[in-house]
Regions:
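A generic structural signal for alpha->beta connector loops
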Residues: 43-45, 267
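Polyanionic, low-complexity intrinsically disordered segments
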Residues: 1-42, 56, 61-67, 80, ...
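Core structural elements
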Residues: 9, 79-88, 126-133
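Short, flexible helix-loop junctions that flank or precede catalytic/ligand sites
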Residues: 98-472
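Residues that form generic nucleotide/phosphate-binding pockets
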Residues: 42, 59-63, 73-77, 86, ...
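General small-molecule cofactor/ligand-binding pocket signal
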Residues: 47-51
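Charged, low-hydrophobicity low-complexity segments
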Residues: 53-111
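Alpha-helix initiation and N-capping motif
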Residues: 36, 53-57, 66-67, 80-83, ...
Length: 472
């Protein structure tokens, strides 16, 4: 942690760090000479360290990323809540660490968002109860309590968030949805805000989307090399449908983005229809669904087909109309990538047939289905070998992993490739069991079987694989 204010250090291109071996002053070619003299005058002698401009950017971001612990701020906020000041015009924040506003509720919200980004939380829950509120983070797919403000502070927190998301702070009876775009220590973060009224006040959930996370490659998603090679072949076909299935929060959209990033947008016309657009993809036209103005998936898809597309990505197939347009698009020379909510890969076929898609159309258009789940990785600092199960490891918990025993996540997958034999079965209206048997004979392995390689390598625990594959 640096002793210099973040805004000043960033502007002057200078970083002061103190430790057991004394103070270190890190500068780059663009650092003004007077700022070095000023820091030494204020803080005393310091060893000078020179780095490149781009190196200093990373050092600044990491040094100040720990600014503002939510738990440390909440006590001060409870003692000096100023609702009148909160409701005044608040200047737009471009980087949370730049703001010098001392309003306690504002500082607490900033601390909550900063800490959530640092902990790589996917969601922040602010939940009102009879006597208190609870703030929880969803990290690695599981919720954990962060802080419990007094009930009197809850309304101020919600109002501040609604102001940032440009929502109506006077409307407390109806659900509202909004968006906040900001930066935390230089990282662009997009926040989707959802409020809903409850018996004890408004409940808020904020979904954090790290813009840099959308740049993942397929190789980083934890796929078995054999699955990766087959999937790579599927998405390079000139036409057909490739589906990604799984429950909410299983990484389906991330996999689709990684697949699109693998394709050449400079020689192909790639368009997407999403709700919402989670990450900006360079060279790709992304269309946002908007139910308020009847901009549905089906309407957007019809418009896209008049835009001379080569590849179409559909955020989710939710109804028969969208499914029919996707199938027709794939049959007329387009590659269609889409997500669907099913428990495993094979059941995607029956889900589309249940929606009303004709089996003979599916047999002609489908290329393959990727089903996936996310499993938590064991913390490498505290995991221990399980004496009851030689060759496997178990979670323990330490300060590094917040005493959960897990840190980070990876994927387990099953890939259902549609060959000629399976096409014939689909055309004949075969059931899931017959399709699964044919897929197994062709070499498909289940998500649970895929997870065994992570257990053998010590990356996760056996019970974690069972937890996420109970319904598969």
């Amino acid at each position: 942690m640096s002793a210099l204010p973040y805004a000043w250090a960033k502007a002057q291109r200078i970083l002061l760090r103190t430790g057991e071996e004394g103070a270190v002053l890190t500068v780059c070619p663009s650092t003004p000479g007077w700022s070095i003299s000023e820091v030494r005058r204020q803080f005393g002698p310091a060893r000078l360290e020179r780095v490149r401009d781009e190196e200093l950017d990373g050092l600044l971001a990491s040094a100040y990323a720990d600014t503002g612990s939510a738990a440390a701020v909440v006590g001060a906020a409870e003692n000096e809540v100023d609702l009148d000041r909160l409701m005044q015009d608040i200047p737009e924040i471009t980087d949370l660490l730049d703001t010098q506003d001392g309003a306690p509720v504002i500082r607490m919200i900033n601390a909550l968002l900063t800490q959530a980004a640092r902990d790589e939380a996917s969601d922040i829950h602010i939940e009102p109860y009879e006597s208190h509120s609870v703030v929880r983070y969803r990290v690695d797919g599981t919720l954990r309590d962060v802080v419990s403000p007094r009930k009197a502070l809850h309304g101020a927190l919600v109002s501040r968030i609604k102001i940032m998301a440009q929502l109506d702070i006077a409307e407390k009876r109806l659900p509202q949805d909004g968006r906040i775009a900001l930066r935390v220590a230089g990282r662009p973060i997009d926040i989707r805000v959802s409020t809903v009224p409850t018996g004890h006040g408004e409940r808020v959930v904020m979904r954090l989307l790290d813009k840099q996370a959308g740049r993942l490659q397929l190789e980083t998603l934890g796929m078995d090399p054999q699955v990766l090679a087959k999937l790579d072949n599927l998405i390079r076909q000139p036409h057909g449908i490739v589906l990604v299935t799984g429950p909410t929060g299983s990484g389906k959209t991330t996999s689709l983005y990684a697949a699109l990033a693998r394709l050449d947008a400079s020689t192909s016309n790639i368009l997407t229809v999403e709700d919402p657009v989670e990450y900006d993809l360079p060279g790709i036209s992304q269309i946002q669904v908007n139910a308020k103005i009847d901009m549905t998936f089906a309407l957007a898809l019809r418009a896209i087909l008049r835009q001379d597309p080569d590849i179409i990505m559909i955020g989710e197939i939710r109804d028969l109309e969208t499914a029919q347009i996707a199938v027709q698009a794939s049959l007329t020379g387009h590659l269609v990538l889409a997500t669907l909510h099913t428990n495993d890969a094979v059941s995607a076929v029956n889900r589309l047939i249940d929606m009303g898609v004709e089996p003979f159309l599916l047999a002609s258009s489908m290329l393959g289905v990727l089903a996936q789940r996310l499993v938590r990785r064991l913390c490498q600092h505290c995991k221990q070998e399980d004496p009851a199960a030689p060759g496997s490891w178990r979670p323990v918990g330490c300060a590094v992993c917040n005493h959960t025993g897990y840190s980070g996540r990876t994927g387990i997958h099953e890939l259902f490739c549609i060959d000629d034999d399976i096409r014939t079965l689909i055309h004949q209206g075969a059931g899931e069991q017959a399709l699964r048997a044919a897929a197994r004979e062709a070499g498909m392995f289940s998500m649970r079987e895929d997870g065994e390689r992570w257990v053998r390598s010590g990356a996760t625990a056996p019970e974690e694989i069972l937890r996420v594959t109970r319904d598969a």
